[in-house]
Swiss-Prot record:
GTP hydrolase that promotes the GTP-dependent binding of aminoacyl-tRNA to the A-site of ribosomes during protein biosynthesis. It comes from Halorhodospira halophila (strain DSM 244 / SL1). GTP binds at residues 19-26, 81-85, 136-139. This is Elongation factor Tu 1. Residues 19-26 are annotated as: G1. InterPro entries: EF-Tu_GTP-bd, EF-Tu_GTPase, EFTu-like_2, EFTU_2, G_TR_CS, P-loop_NTPase, Small_GTP-bd, T_Tr_GTP-bd_dom. Mg(2+) binds at T26. The lineage of its organism: Bacteria, Pseudomonadati, Pseudomonadota, Gammaproteobacteria, Chromatiales. Signal peptide: none annotated. Monomer. PANTHER family: ELONGATION FACTOR TU, MITOCHONDRIAL, ELONGATION FACTOR TU-RELATED. The gene is tuf1. Keywords: Cytoplasm, Elongation factor, GTP-binding, Hydrolase, Magnesium, Metal-binding, Nucleotide-binding, Protein biosynthesis.
């Protein structure tokens, strides 16, 4: 069976459903595929197909995730839905399924619940840019005032975590009715309205090639008569021959000029996001640069040692620790291409962290790393991954 060719006619956006267990995330996911398949083509996916999500391994962590796709008038959406709460936590922290925006599903019959709050917090910590809200199961609420009350609660909760609670679109409906083909206001029209809200409110993400140039350095070579070459995969932006670049991290930041770019042993005028390149650097000795540093556009990223992070600690079954860790824990933090030792400070009132938990922590590294909010890392002990994290706030 030949695979269908992916036609890129519309801009592509990654989204996902978040919210409390049994509030209707998977039913909404199924309804989105069905209603939009009818409107714009594509495949409808049944609840069972989505609910029995296959397990995937991302950075050594097992996550169950369902991937569906659908199209609106103007966009192509890839949508992730997770069966269990733990899968959401892992997914958001590891960035296994990057989200350009989230659909927060809240049952109108129950209002916001503990996981509603936790998912909003996670979305804030890992830097999800936008949220739209679907007040589900609204057919079970007869009282219009009650619906308004739940909407107010959700907006306040979003504002508590620095989202724009006053202006975030809130769409009211019933995913189940929509899935059953009901054409009343709560049914299919509510799904269309939700997608219009997503089109309008979730911003188009910047393409990697449009960002400031950044390349994590993987290897360093000395080529006699030519100088020093650093190799790696360009993470974002473009590097042109003759441009100034900085080497950031581990030691003091150094400025140099890129005098050559090569790929597959051929010389190029430039390298761009996604390319595996070698960059020839002027006046840099082999010992001036090492794996773990980054090559970047000058002044675009800075080195830091002290930061706050949201971390998921692998369970014993995932090959993680068998025992908890405490304040002052000193593992290695693996950023991009290298390990740096760091000391963990737990939040006040948290005595210890058990395998399988997620926790907010502060980390002090022994050497600086080129860092920005949203940077992902692994926590390792002797080369074995015991946790995954994301930088939520740089301190210094």
């Amino acid at each position: 069976m030949s695979k269908e060719k992916f036609e890129r006619k519309k801009p592509h956006i990654n989204v996902g459903t978040i919210g409390h267990v049994d509030h209707g995330k998977t039913t909404l996911t199924a309804a989105l595929t069905k209603v939009l398949a009818e409107a714009h083509g594509g495949d409808a996916r049944a609840f069972d197909q989505i609910d029995n999500a296959p397990e995937e391994r991302a950075r050594g962590i097992t996550i169950a995730t369902a991937h569906v796709e659908y199209e609106s008038e103007s966009r192509h959406y890839a949508h992730v839905d997770c069966p269990g709460h733990a899968d959401y936590v892992k997914n958001m922290i590891t960035g296994a399924a990057q989200m350009d925006g989230s659909i927060l599903v809240v049952s109108a019959a129950d209002g916001p619940m503990p996981q509603t709050r936790e998912h909003i917090l996670l979305a804030r910590q890992v830097g999800v840019p936008a949220i739209v809200v679907f007040l589900n199961k609204a057919d079970m609420v007869d009282d219009a005032e009650l619906l308004e009350l739940v909407e107010m609660e959700v907006r306040e909760l979003l504002s508590d975590y620095d989202f724009d609670g006053d202006n975030i679109p809130v769409v009211t409906g019933s995913a189940l009715k929509a899935l059953e083909g009901d054409d009343s206001e709560m049914g299919r029209p509510a799904i269309i309205k939700l997608v219009e809200a997503m089109d309008a409110h979730i911003p188009q993400p910047e393409r990697p090639v449009d960002g400031d140039f950044l390349m994590p350095i993987e290897d360093v070579f000395s080529i006699s008569g030519r100088g020093t070459v650093v190799t790696g995969r360009v993470e974002r932006g473009v590097i042109k021959v003759g441009e100034e670049v900085e080497i950031v991290g581990i030691t003091d930041t150094r400025k140099t000029t890129c005098t050559g770019v090569e790929m597959f042993r051929k010389l190029l005028d430039q390298g761009e996001a996604g390319d595996n390149i070698g960059a020839l650097l002027r006046g840099i000795k082999r010992d001036d640069v090492e794996r773990g540093q980054v090559l970047c556009k000058p002044k675009s990223i800075t080195p830091h040692t002290h930061f706050e992070a949201e971390v998921y600690v692998l369970s014993k079954d995932e090959g993680g620790r068998h025992t908890p860790f405490f304040n002052g824990y000193r593992p290695q933090f693996y950023f991009r291409t290298t390990d740096v030792t760091g000391t963990v400070t737990l939040p006040e009132g948290t005595e210890m962290v058990m395998p399988g938990d997620n926790v907010k922590m502060t980390v002090q590294l022994i050497a600086p790393i080129a860092m920005e909010d949203g940077l992902r890392f692994a926590i390792r002990e002797g080369g074995r991954t015991v946790g995954a994290g994301v930088v939520s706030k740089i301190i210094e």
